[in-house]
Amino acid sequence: MADAEMENKMGTENEYGADQIQILEGLEAVRKRPGMYIGSTSARGLHHLVYEIVDNAVDEALAGYCKNIEVTINPDNSITVEDDGRGIPVGMNHKAGKSALEVVYTVLHAGGKFGGGGYKVSGGLHGVGASVVNALSTKLSVEVYKDGQIYSQSYKIGKPDEPVKVIGKCSAEKHGTKVTFHPDPTIFEETVYDYDTLKQRLRETAFLTKGLRIVLSDARVDPVHTHEFHYAGGIKEFVTYLNKSKEALYPEVIYCEGTRDGVYVEVAMQHNDSYNDATYSFVNNIITPEGGTHLAGFRNALTKTFNTYARANKILK
């Protein structure tokens, strides 16, 4: 190829002008760059899909409306998450011109957790997590149990098959949301879920949400493999669990809780014979591995309390 022709071709390929700026509509951006939304397309990202849906159910529990969450790995490696919360709203969202349920599952940055009315505490974001899971699934179906009716909508690669419709009746007492999704094998490196990975995460979630019952079932095996997590003691039981292979220096877990300026705080601790620090901090049930002012404040207060006691009892000069 002549030098002039080569230079002309390279110039065209490297051209960067106004027309090279792409506009990705709807959930297209999620499929184009999934790592921006779920971290990766490896096994870690695959399991993150489950956490996104579960976190939405947990937020209902944190708001005081959900007591039970059931997570099932189906025989075809799809996932079903069902909760007994209030159920995602199904009425018409007048701004979007469609059902609120469809908005939640098809529009990024749409949900009930951006303002102060729907949720005072939340770890997930309806309309971010839910719509991302939908975008990265070949199929997703959602059922909402509300006001004695069962509402349903199904999607393929993030797009609704038809508008939200009523598919049946349920008891007036039944309420909640049931979601089933099939991860897209063209997006993820693997689509086989690891039971132990989900078990570890769901156990931790149950510890952090006092009184919440979470059931994990693996329907890929016969008989179905099931674990139930329910901890009335919450993070007190979490500390006991973390210390089970160590020798505690005193029998009772120290626990305190309180609210100041509208912020609720729980602390549980129990020293053991290890020299390694094992302090875990969470905000709205989401672990904060890098710490933050909440952890720094706790450590400062703990140090100050120990020093004050030690000086008062002439242990520390």
PLM region spans:
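Bergerat-fold GHKL ATPase/HATPase_c domain
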Residues: 2-54, 103-105
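Flexible hinge/switch segments at interdomain interfaces of large molecular machines
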Residues: 23-31, 74-75, 170-180, 269-283
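Flexible beta-alpha connector loops of hexameric P-loop NTPases
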Residues: 37-44, 89-95, 188, 287-290
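Short, conserved non-catalytic motifs in the polymerase core
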Residues: 38-40, 118-120, 125, 279-289
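Conserved ATP-binding N-box helix of the HATPase_c
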Residues: 44-67, 129-136
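A conserved short beta-strand within the histidine kinase catalytic ATPase domain
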Residues: 67-73
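GHKL/Histidine-kinase-like ATPase module
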Residues: 163-166, 196, 203-205, 211, ...
